[in-house]
């Protein structure tokens, strides 16, 4: 049986709804609104049955389509950062006073570098809280654990030890994802309160990061940067009205990843959007103040 591969809950829901010819699935609440210049789709998986169908843990997934903002180059950084920050703040709630931000992925492989690059733009304040000028700030620490092939240590193991030492209220993990559609690459951001499996975007699944493994809530920020070749082929054929595809013709293509040719520039820009979005969600700063602090 041919299957699309996607890490986006919104896409998984769309695919199953199309297959069953339904508006939504039992056990799933989904709605799309337009705010702050972009469409925001919220998918809440309420039951274990729905979670199994979608292949995603129970919880809330919020997907922002930033493509309308990216067409206006004048203030795209500010508007996109504000949009991400507002949705993340709503997801976190009011009780998170200290956060560990984890930039997951391989900084040396561009499509997988969104986590480490975003972490560079997060305002670190844990060591400044004793200073009266920063007493109202959220305590934020940052870690980029690298990948198993570089360190010999699972990201989960590194983060679990750090969580025990730092004792944050929550972890925010940033990582690359896979999409079913080229149109969503580097233009979509998924936020969730369900944790994340590092490396899923590039097909290298590692130990999951979740409340069960780290002991604190784990919020995930994911950006689709790749499409696997088999999924891309299925998507293109579907658009062309071809549904009778021989599964044998696609065998072996699941290990081939496709990304955009300007991925370096895309990651560089999106990393600032994600990093600044986290800062705006956590700190009592407006965008101009944040830019002054971050240089």
Show which residues each predicted segment covers.
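An N-terminal, well-structured beta->alpha segment
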Residues: 49-94
């Amino acid at each position: 049986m041919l299957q699309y591969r996607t890490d986006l809950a919104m896409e998984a829901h769309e695919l199953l709804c199309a297959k069953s010819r339904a508006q939504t699935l039992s056990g799933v609440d989904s709605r799309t609104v337009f705010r702050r210049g972009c469409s925001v789709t919220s998918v809440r998986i309420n039951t274990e049955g729905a979670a199994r169908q979608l292949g995603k843990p129970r919880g809330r997934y919020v997907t922002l389509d930033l493509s309308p903002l990216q067409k206006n180059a004048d203030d795209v950084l500010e508007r996109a950062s504000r949009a991400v920050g507002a949705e993340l703040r709503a997801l976190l709630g009011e009780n998170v006073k200290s956060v560990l931000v984890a930039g997951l992925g391989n900084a040396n492989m561009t499509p997988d570098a969104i986590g480490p690059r975003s972490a560079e733009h997060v305002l670190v304040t844990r060591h400044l809280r004793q200073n009266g000028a920063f007493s109202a700030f959220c305590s934020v620490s940052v870690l980029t654990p690298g990948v198993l092939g570089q360190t010999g240590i699972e990201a989960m193991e590194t983060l679990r030890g750090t969580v025990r030492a730092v004792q944050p209220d929550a972890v925010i993990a940033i990582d690359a994802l896979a999409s079913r559609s080229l149109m969503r690459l580097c233009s979509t951001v998924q936020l969730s309160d369900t944790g994340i499996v590092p490396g899923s975007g590039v097909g290298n699944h590692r130990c999951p990061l979740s409340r069960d493994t780290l002991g604190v809530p784990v919020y995930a920020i994911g950006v689709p940067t790749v499409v696997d070749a088999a999924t891309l082929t299925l998507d293109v054929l579907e658009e062309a009205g071809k549904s009778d595809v021989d599964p044998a013709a696609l065998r072996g293509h699941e290990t081939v990843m496709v990304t955009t040719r300007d991925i370096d520039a895309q990651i560089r820009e999106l990393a600032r959007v994600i990093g600044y979005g986290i800062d705006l969600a956590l700190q009592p700063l407006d965008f101009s103040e944040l830019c002054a602090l971050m240089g």
